[in-house]
Amino acid sequence: MAATRMISIVGKKDAGKTTLVVALAAELVRRKFRVMTIKHGTHAADWDQRGKDTWRHRHEGKAERVVLEAPGERVVWERRELESDPISLARRYLDGAEMVLVEGFTDHALPKIETYRQACGPDPIWSAERPDAEQWVAMVTDNAKFRAPFPVFRFSDTAWLVTLANIAWDRALILPP
């Protein structure tokens, strides 16, 4: 089995992170790689409905972990005290992934591709002064004047996805077994 690679897609709110994760995932799947994703949420997830069986298992029954098995999909709800890092999450839940695309987790030590739109703020998250600046491997932006010591792609272009997928694959963190 191939080693698992991980790369993080970071950016400010509404900068296009999810759109890029989806596009990269689709391109890598097209290449026949087994792709899985991790999404970092900033607020409590509320996917269950009050009074439904799984909600009752979790809230009334106080179950630590609930697995919902349905036709074509599986959902796991798990109580946790502390936030896990993306590498631990991948090791625990994403066995068999060849590439894990991580949306968010900016402060974790993973190679990063940033989405930066000027409407989201005057500056990207990356700056040369950041102590972790070397973790950035590429940027996609609408700022035609932006320059960096790594590849910079423009949202307005249409031919960069294949190249960016190559960069993601080549520069991703390879998890040791």
What are these regions (language model features)?
Residues 1-4:
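Phosphate-binding P-loop
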Residues 9:
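Hydrophobic anchor at the beta1->P-loop junction of P-loop NTPases
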Residues 13:
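The conserved Walker
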Residues 17:
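Conserved lysine of the Walker
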Residues 23-81:
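N-terminal phosphate/diphosphate-binding loop that engages ATP/GTP or pyrophosphate donors
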Residues 77-108:
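Phosphate-binding/switch loop-helix module in NTP-utilizing enzymes
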Residues 99-174:
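Phosphate/Mg2+-binding loops and adjacent switch elements
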